[in-house]
Regions:
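Active-site-proximal region of nucleotide-activated glycan assembly enzymes
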Residues: 32-34, 53, 116-178
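Acidic donor-binding loop of glycosyltransferase active sites
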Residues: 97-99, 260, 264-281, 290
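Conserved nucleotide-sugar phosphate-binding/catalytic loop shared by glycosyltransferases and other
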Residues: 3-10, 26, 30-83, 165, ...
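A short helix/loop element that forms part of the nucleotide-sugar donor recognition site in Leloir-type
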Residues: 73, 174-186, 344
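Glycosyltransferases and closely related glycan-assembly transferases
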Residues: 87-100, 108-123, 136-141
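Donor-nucleotide binding loops and adjacent catalytic segments primarily
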Residues: 46, 64-65, 178-183, 187-272, ...
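A short, well-ordered alpha-helix in the C-terminal region of glycosyltransferases
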Residues: 344-358
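C-terminal alpha-helical cap of glycosyltransferases
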Residues: 357-374
Length: 374
């Protein structure tokens, strides 16, 4: 069996594909797997680290603007897509895939388009309740459209091809032991807080966390804190933290990283997670059952992150803070209130696990296997 996974841009598109690829490899050890993504993005780090071959093609996303710069950007994007489709066809003729699986991001469109034009079975997975542009375009000719939420089904032209499967997460998010995870990180007895705001980072939230570090220092560092700056915050955030009176190189209570590559282990060790509210992140948090504070990005299409966060908050499975309301003091107060309330933490763990489908990767594998047998 030969499978191609296509995804890219952010970890939210890449990690679900890796979760399914891992499950397929468990079932079929001889299965050949190839990933196709876009040059210059997170897939160049995450996919090889997961042990899979990756081919990256030049790509560019579409602009939703209406000015001349946006027009030029979109002309460039279309040219990139056309060239990438040709490149994918060459790859397919050599690799001979039995199916192509897309998990979102503009990087996945050329491979899906090429596969559909060559009669290769395709399957797309959409993690958000409202489908993204790539999913909308690819879904019309896809053999199977897999969604995380029942509410998503009416948005597709061919509902008979749509199946609700949930959101795939890697098995290590489900089965990693908390005490073993803490031991691996060398933690002391203090609680662990983990904060991350997407693989690219978020300037506003990095600034807020820098202020939060100052409050933690003033309180005598009552908890350990691991923070991921993201790709665009790594160069400048350490200096900002120093300006708050905290030396990130010398202070052992804080651990500043560009990206948390061992997220399953770090998340499993955590007592509180602070993050955005992308569907992939919410499901990973749910699989671990870790009390969380969600600060949805206000800069995403259809405001889908706030909808994700409100759904969890309405079920008392998360604390929701809008970015515009999130100050260092408010965030510190929410963290300490949560850490001091054991019954509330336990309730959040229970509610989170109730809302997550832990068999999503297995269900997707069943569907992919059936496609390959056609």
């Amino acid at each position: 069996m030969n499978l191609i996974f296509t995804c890219g841009g952010t970890a939210g598109h890449i990690n679900p594909a890796i979760a399914v690829a891992n499950m397929m490899k468990e079932r079929f050890p001889d299965c050949r797997i190839l990933f196709i993504g876009a040059s210059g993005h997170m897939e160049e780090k995450l996919v090889p680290q997961a042990g899979y071959e990756l081919k990256c093609l030049p790509g560019s996303g579409l602009s939703r603007g209406k000015n001349l710069a946006a027009l030029k950007q979109n002309i460039h994007a279309v040219r990139c897509v056309l060239n990438a489709v040709k490149a994918c066809k060459r790859i397919f003729r050599e690799f001979q895939p039995d199916a192509v699986i897309g998990t979102g991001g503009y990087a996945s469109f050329p491979a899906l388009q090429a596969a559909q034009s060559m009669g290769i079975p395709t399957c797309v997975h959409e993690s958000n309740a409202l489908p993204g542009l790539t999913t909308k375009l690819a879904a019309n000719k896809a053999d199977k459209v897999l969604v995380a939420f029942e509410e998503s089904v009416p948005y597709y032209k061919h509902p008979e091809r749509v199946e609700v499967v949930g959101m795939p997460v890697r098995r290590e998010f489900i089965f990693t032991d908390k005490e073993q995870a803490r031991k691996k990180l060398g933690l002391d007895s203090r609680p662990l807080v983990v904060s991350a705001f997407g693989s690219n980072g978020a300037k506003v939230m990095n600034e807020t966390v820098a202020g939060l570090f100052r409050l933690e220092k003033e309180a005598g560092f009552p908890f350990r804190h691991i923070h991921a700056t993201g790709r665009f915050g790594w160069e400048w955030m350490p200096d900002l933290v120093r300006s708050q009176g905290v030396d990130p190189d010398a202070e052992e209570s804080i651990d500043l990283r560009e990206y948390i590559y061992d997220m399953a282990n770090v998340m499993s060790a955590a007592d509180v997670i602070i993050s955005r509210a992308g569907a992939s992140t919410c499901n990973e948090i749910g699989a671990c059952g870790i009390p969380c504070i969600l600060i949805p990005s206000p800069n995403v299409t259809n405001n889908h992150q706030e909808k994700n966060a409100r759904m969890l908050a309405d079920h008392e499975a998360a604390v929701l803070i809008l970015e515009k309301d999130c100050t260092p003091q408010k965030l510190y107060d929410e963290i300490t209130a949560l850490l001091s309330d054991g019954p509330r933490q336990e309730q959040m763990r229970r509610r989170l696990r109730e809302m997550v489908r832990l068999d999503a990767a297995e269900r997707i594998c069943d569907i992919v296997e059936a496609l390959c047998k056609r």
